């Protein structure tokens, strides 16, 4: 492959394409003479749309095909939403870069209502995320939660067709697709703890590819890496995939990293929370320790039940 060419494996969804185009533009801006090509692909998570994600099962639903393309030499890098990236990588691949994080919050989207509090009793809310479901149900047990799959455009179309009174989406995706005007209100991390890595973009490549690693290096964002490292470490210790009722959110102030974690029963009947803070240098340790605290409070019982039903 040409020394002046990088090929990006990406999902075909508009949001995935935006992320790949963003990385392409950044690389071409930094490295004069570099050509970046996109290799759009369909993944298992994109193809199976009639089944709730929790039942499709497996970690890495949206990344496996992209990884095969890199291992076979068809692509040099893959660009992912960090919340979709499994903890373990196939031999020969690794997470080389985490770019600066966009807004990590969830967004409340409705054509009629401004906030979750405004929804009338029995209103229908669309989300396929068990993490969002458990937090909404805990706050508003009177609401009806209906599954919602598909890319951002498909989900908005289902809302507009009257299938739902409101839907919950990641704020970052709507902002990136220039759909911020669809957001009725942002849901604070206090109200809905985000997923680990939410709003951050990661770049995966072959671990032995020194040329590509050197080209990618300027895109690394140290603070985002520390925050996401803590969140992912917590998720890993809990053995969470991308479809679990787990929330994790880290913030940094100076050299101090504060981490909040949550595990909830999808029916909203029980929400277990914990928080801790420490040095940014200990991001991974903090994540593991917070997971241990959640487990000591009964998180394993909830997660075992979720996996048994999946």
Swiss-Prot record:
GO terms for biological process: protoporphyrinogen IX biosynthetic process. Pathway: Porphyrin-containing compound metabolism; protoporphyrin-IX biosynthesis; coproporphyrinogen-III from 5-aminolevulinate: step 2/4. Binds 1 dipyrromethane group covalently. Keywords: Porphyrin biosynthesis, Transferase. GO terms for molecular function: hydroxymethylbilane synthase activity. InterPro entries: HemC, Porphobilin_deaminase_cofac_BS, Porphobilin_deaminase_N, Porphobilinogen_deaminase_C, Porphobilinogen_deaminase_C_sf. PANTHER family: PORPHOBILINOGEN DEAMINASE. Tetrapolymerization of the monopyrrole PBG into the hydroxymethylbilane pre-uroporphyrinogen in several discrete steps. This is Porphobilinogen deaminase. It comes from Shewanella pealeana (strain ATCC 700345 / ANG-SQ1).
